[in-house]
Amino acid sequence: AWVRAAQMQSATLEELVQLQHANETARHRVVGLVIETRPDAVTPDALTLIRQLGATKIQMGIQSLDQQILDSNDRGIRIERIQRAFELLRAFGFKIHAHAMVNLLGATPESDKCDYRSLVTEAPYQPDEIKLYPCALIEGARLCRDFDSGAWIPYTEDALMDVLAADVLATPSFCRISRMIRDFSSNDIKAGNKKPNLRQMVEQR
């Protein structure tokens, strides 16, 4: 069944081009296609192919622009590579949807505010959309040992709300915040925010 499903969802580039042309005059058209990737996978060759596939927007997990925080959380990427990814995406004409995370290991409320402000206001970043997540600890994650040792402590609800409210206010009008929590069951979250209406709470603050 899986093989048959995969075959039904496969096509050659030639077949794709034919469908793209048909889409141009279709009554109900596909007007946007989003692909998610890592900043270090963004290259001219990759973007050329992604553009051929018809994508119009790229999502990337940035999480932080603080090199020390990236290293502490084993992100395995340099700030310079993230900058290059943004520059390439702009050059290729893609909309950019970045993911940012507060309360990572090594972060503080003030460093989070500064970090986010840099992401949304400074060149070469300034994404078109943002997913703004508070770090939530899931059982089995490497962060569990840092939580158990006291090296990582989740923000209090008041501190988290303060950070997120500041981030919302720092977001330029051209940038849309599309999401503010991850889709995890509260039963799976060992530590961190469990409020499903967190964004509503922040916006009412």
Set out the residue ranges of the language-model regions:
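Conserved non-cysteine loop/helix-boundary elements of the Radical SAM core domain that shape
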Residues: 1-97, 101-158, 162
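C-terminal accessory regions of radical SAM enzymes
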Residues: 151-205
